[in-house]
Amino acid sequence: VITALQAIRLASRFCQKVRKELAEGASIQKIDRSPVTIADYGSQAIICKLIKDTFPDDIVVAEEDSAELKKPNHLNILRQVTGYVHDLFPGTSSDEVCSWIDLSSHSIKNRFWTLDPIDGTKGFLRGDQYAIALALIENGLIQLGLMACPNLYADKDRPDEKRGCLFLALRGKGSFQMELDGEGRQTLSVSKVSDPVKASFTESVEPDHADHLIH
């Protein structure tokens, strides 16, 4: 848990900094036309590195690889990714960043981690909501789940406070909301509201994912 928390918090701070300083042309369009940004690559590199440093035999199944990043027309993106990662790990080279990204594997064993370095890249690009999602799976069961939301208000009733919160679930021990940069936490539970009229519903912030005629 300590390593996972450290990794996802560090990746969150990385993403917050990148978003604050984000420049035009800081994303690549993949074959499926979905965007991938400096933050996607850097977040994956950071988390894969920290997990593999602590658990060298563990597999990480993640979304990106460095193939697009290494293309001549994307070398500026690679330089930017390396620069931001270098701020966290001084002395880091572009080759090392690519090797950390490529620690991701497409094969799995009884124990493996699964990572989405940025879930909601479009939201990230427009300064809206996105998440960093990490889970540990053993023998087909999720043992640990983490979701960092760097741009989400920790308390919707107090929007003047700084943004960023973290959600942690541990098998057999419950679920918690935590501070992104602190030790404060509160236990989460399923709502006791049974009347759907009184219930709160949530849906994707992306219109294409929230078509009420389909979903």
Predicted regions and their residues:
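Flexible, active-site-adjacent loop/turn segments at secondary-structure boundaries
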Residues: 34, 122-123, 186
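Short, glycine/acidic-rich beta->alpha junctions
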Residues: 43, 126-129, 161
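Glycine-rich active-site/cofactor-binding loop and its immediate structural neighborhood
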Residues: 112-137
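N-terminal subdomain of lithium-sensitive/metallo-dependent phosphomonoesterases centered on the IMPase/IPPase/PAP
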Residues: 1-118, 152-153, 180, 200, ...
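Short, flexible micro-motifs
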Residues: 65, 123-126, 148
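Short, conserved acidic/polar surface loops in the N-terminal third of protein domains
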Residues: 71-74, 125-127, 157
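Acidic beta-strand-loop-alpha-helix segment within the catalytic core
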Residues: 131-215
